[in-house]
């Protein structure tokens, strides 16, 4: 992670199961962590727990900054922008970066809340329905809403983190590495987190069956549902 490259990362349990995921962006002498709004307090507390006595200051700046999304095409209009996942530029004081998970998600911009409307005007951006963004994310297969429902229920590698540039198998030790590496190296990946859509009705049962065989389990039941689906 540096001034021109942001990344996708996660926190796992010692067993390699999902806890949190977030984006990391270089900011002055520190870093921004961009995560789901509902997970801010829990992530802050978890990081504060890991800090121990290290000389690291962790701040919750969610009341000072806001994140907005823009299209890949709009991002590439900016001077110096490159069509590379995670590529980051700075427009005045605002960080703009192409989503490191999938370019199809477009770019994100971190804006000081007090200057939000001024920044959007100078960037020639206009507000749109936020559900359009989450619908796109759901179609691509990236869970960004109600991710607390995944905690301790699914391995990070089953969340497609390798495909989303969120796992580096050349990296040194990290919490959850042993099981993550074992699943990868021994080809033990037997299920994945996938988006599901209802033809009609509503989700009443967690279990998903195909021809009387259990093939998966619904983990996120809300507006943009996801399930852990087994390979057949």
Where are these regions (language model features)?
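Anionic-ligand-binding alpha/beta catalytic cores of soluble enzymes and soluble regulatory domains
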Residues: 102, 107-193
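A generic beta-sheet turn/junction motif
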Residues: 15, 26-28, 51, 189, ...
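Glycine-centered loop/turn motifs
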Residues: 2-5, 83-90, 201-207
């Amino acid at each position: 992670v540096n001034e021109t490259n942001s990344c996708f990362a996660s926190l796992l349990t010692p067993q390699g199961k999902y806890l949190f995921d977030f984006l990391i962006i270089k900011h002055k002498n520190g870093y921004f962590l961009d995560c789901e709004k509902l997970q801010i307090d829990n992530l802050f507390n978890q990081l504060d727990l890991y800090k121990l006595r290290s000389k690291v200051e962790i701040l919750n700046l969610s009341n000072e900054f806001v994140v907005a999304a823009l299209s890949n095409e709009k991002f590439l209009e900016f001077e110096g922008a490159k069509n590379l996942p995670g590529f980051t530029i700075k427009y005045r004081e605002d960080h703009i970066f192409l989503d490191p998970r999938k370019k199809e998600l477009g770019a994100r911009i971190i804006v000081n809340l007090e200057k939000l409307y001024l920044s959007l005007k100078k960037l020639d951006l206009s507000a749109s329905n936020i559900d359009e963004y989450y619908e796109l994310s759901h179609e691509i297969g990236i869970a960004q809403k109600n991710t607390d429902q995944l905690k301790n229920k699914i391995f990070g590698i089953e969340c497609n983190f390798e495909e989303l540039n969120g796992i580096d198998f050349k990296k040194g030790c990290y919490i959850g590495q042993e099981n993550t590496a074992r699943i990868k190296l021994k080809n033990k990946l037997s299920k994945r987190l996938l988006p599901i859509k209802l033809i009609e009705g509503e989700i009443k049962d967690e279990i998903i069956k195909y021809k009387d065989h259990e093939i998966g389990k619904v983990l996120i039941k809300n507006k943009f549902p996801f399930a852990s689906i087994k390979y057949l």
